[in-house]
Amino acid sequence: DIDDDMWKFADQDTKDALLYGIKSGDIWLNKIKFDPEGNRIYGNVCLEVYLPSRGTCLLQHVNLGACTLDDLQEAFTTAMSQLCDLHGRTGVGESGEYLTPSVDRQVGLGMLGLSNFLRRYNITYKDFGEALRLVNLGHSANNEAGCAAVALDIAIFEAAQIARQNDMVRAFAIAPTASCSYRSRDLDGFTCTPEIAPPI
């Protein structure tokens, strides 16, 4: 929990040791965050989600590369329903080491294969970004990118509704890690890209 003052007044040996630890992967650089009620939340080791002390993460993903435009809503609602159903049945709170599911009300649905999905419809990141911007402003784009942005917006909205109905305080995450994507294929048999990353 280093803040600006602590860093400013730390001696050079301490700074060097911290930077070395971050560079070698032994120390994670993470922001100090609070939930909407002002309670401290902490970055998980993967840095994909922030959790309360003794909180756990329950993550799943939607493989966009395995979806068509017409599949998105069902993929997101099914995945969120599965997460919310599994949430109370993990037994993770029984040990006393972690928060119980009645207290720790969060799941994390992420996505992978965005570039695979966009490739299928010949949509550039630029066009998709512009279409998303318009959709977020309440407008629409009358092209393939606009159709994809609207379909994704509806799918995420419907999944969020399921999370709300299950009293989840968080429903989405930057998940999963890259290793999940490399084991996933798109509709054409190509390896999926991680998270929402472009191909490398």
Region roles according to the model:
Residues 1-200:
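Long, C-terminal-biased catalytic regions of enzyme "large/alpha" subunits
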